[in-house]
């Protein structure tokens, strides 16, 4: 084998690896998109069927089950929210911190999600949310409306985002900046309807 052949071979291998990484990323995004759309469609059909739980007898879904749909029109975001914060949950949806209340209950409902360019990119545009933007939470019984009242960045070990409150509050949090994840972006919203 001569040097010229080896250089060509190494070049072809590098191109193949680059294409593999690119196609893998595209494949992950496509799979996540269709999974999200299917989950939202099924949940909306469930709500429309009238088989949802009643306000009087609320049964909180088990870990991994659908809790609600979170909509933020100002950033064109509509995403499923499942119970729990396990890696498998956050790769395909947002996650509800089960140590906090569910939407519509008095207290602090905390929902977390990833910001990434591959898997779990549900909160990629969360940093574009502004004070007074509306956030909608669709549950099997009703839609809750919240208005953004506070936007802040905290340290990763700051657990104050989980603190209970004496009002109906929605707290969204995610890593920031994208990929570096040195801090947490926190969006706080209060129920308006």
For each predicted feature, which ranges?
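Short, Lys/Arg-rich N-terminal segment immediately upstream of the first membrane anchor
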Residues: 1-7
């Amino acid at each position: 084998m001569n040097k010229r052949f080896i250089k060509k071979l190494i070049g072809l291998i590098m191109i193949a690896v680059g294409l593999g990484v690119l196609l893998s990323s595209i494949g992950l995004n496509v799979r996540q998109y269709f999974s999200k759309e299917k989950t939202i469609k099924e949940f909306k059909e469930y709500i429309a069927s009238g088989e949802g739980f009643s306000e009087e007898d609320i049964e909180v879904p088990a870990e991994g089950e659908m809790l609600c749909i979170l909509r933020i029109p100002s950033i064109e975001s509509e995403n499923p929210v499942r119970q729990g914060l396990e890696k498998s949950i956050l790769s395909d949806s947002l996650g509800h911190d089960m140590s906090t209340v569910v939407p519509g209950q008095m207290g602090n409902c905390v929902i977390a999600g990833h910001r990434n360019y591959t898997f779990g990119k549900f909160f990629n545009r969360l940093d574009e949310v502004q004070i007074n933007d509306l956030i909608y939470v669709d549950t099997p019984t009703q839609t809750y409306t919240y208005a953004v009242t506070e936007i802040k960045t905290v340290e990763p070990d700051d657990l104050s985002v989980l603190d209970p409150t004496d009002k109906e509050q929605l707290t969204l949090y995610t890593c920031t900046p994208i990929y570096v994840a040195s801090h947490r972006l926190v969006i706080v919203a209060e129920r308006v309807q």
